[in-house]
Amino acid sequence: ASMRGGANFAAFASAKNGLRALAQSMARELGPKNIHVAHVIIDAAVDTEWIKSINPEYDKKIKTDGIVNPSHLAENYLYLYDQPRDAWTFELDLRPWQETW
């Protein structure tokens, strides 16, 4: 939502875009102090009990990698953490391979 608004999501999209702008400002302010700030976009359902309970297509999506495994998200956050300063990522966009965008 921080990168693209959707119909009926005006409030959510504007808030997410504000979060992105905040992350950009923090990255510029804190980068010179050796603090890595990254904006991570997770455009997906994450495999939790709550998602399992509300998603009628859960079984189908989990079998086809349509729902993100929390461990795989954690691997991406470790990737950000371990980056050398000369190649910091500011924005990381995570989504299942079959997500339409």
For each of these PLM feature ranges, what is it?
Residues A1-G5, S53-D59:
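A short small-residue
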Residues A1-G18, A23-Q24, R28-P32, V46:
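Catalytic loop of short-chain dehydrogenase/reductase
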Residues P32-I35, H39-A44, D59-W101:
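C-terminal helical subdomain
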Residues N8, I35, H39-I54:
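Short beta-loop-alpha junction of Rossmann-like oxidoreductase domains
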Residues S14-N17, P56-K60:
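Short, low-complexity, polar/charged sequence segments that are solvent-exposed and flexible
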